[in-house]
Amino acid sequence: MNLTPREKDKLLIAMAAMVARRRLERGVKLNHPEAIALVSDFVVEGARDGRTVAELMEAGAHVITREQVMDGVAEMIRDIQVEATFPDGTKLVTVHEPIR
């Protein structure tokens, strides 16, 4: 399988998000990379589903709560920026204060 670096990054984020979901199901708090992966995957999949940039910017801030992450993680993540493929092209989506 010949994947571009961007495709490899997308797969890595998707896999990390799957791990994060499993940990949340078990009641395990997420660390920094897992939290970023979960929000990023939400944005990428939302774009593929046809949601707008504005919808994803708002909804992305409600994917995880402070109670679901380890101490200090919420303060470490001020913004998450994700390049996502929408029906009309690739756009940069910024989720401000993604863990509330």
From Swiss-Prot:
<dbReference type="Pfam" id="PF00547">
    <property type="entry name" value="Urease_gamma"/>
</dbReference>
<protein>
    <recommendedName>
        <fullName>Urease subunit gamma 1</fullName>
        <ecNumber>3.5.1.5</ecNumber>
    </recommendedName>
</protein>
<dbReference type="InterPro" id="IPR050069">
    <property type="entry name" value="Urease_subunit"/>
</dbReference>
<dbReference type="GO" id="GO:0005737">
    <property type="term" value="C:cytoplasm"/>
</dbReference>
<comment type="similarity">
    <text>Belongs to the urease gamma subunit family.</text>
</comment>
<keyword id="KW-0963">Cytoplasm</keyword>
<comment type="subunit">
    <text>Heterotrimer of UreA (gamma), UreB (beta) and UreC (alpha) subunits. Three heterotrimers associate to form the active enzyme.</text>
</comment>
<keyword id="KW-0843">Virulence</keyword>
<dbReference type="InterPro" id="IPR036463">
    <property type="entry name" value="Urease_gamma_sf"/>
</dbReference>
<keyword id="KW-0378">Hydrolase</keyword>
<comment type="pathway">
    <text>Nitrogen metabolism; urea degradation; CO(2) and NH(3) from urea (urease route): step 1/1.</text>
</comment>
<dbReference type="InterPro" id="IPR012010">
    <property type="entry name" value="Urease_gamma"/>
</dbReference>
<comment type="function">
    <text>Disruption of the ure1 gene cluster suggests that it protects brucellae during their passage through the stomach. The major route of infection in human brucellosis is oral.</text>
</comment>
<dbReference type="InterPro" id="IPR002026">
    <property type="entry name" value="Urease_gamma/gamma-beta_su"/>
</dbReference>
<dbReference type="GO" id="GO:0043419">
    <property type="term" value="P:urea catabolic process"/>
</dbReference>
<dbReference type="GO" id="GO:0009039">
    <property type="term" value="F:urease activity"/>
</dbReference>
<dbReference type="GO" id="GO:0016151">
    <property type="term" value="F:nickel cation binding"/>
</dbReference>
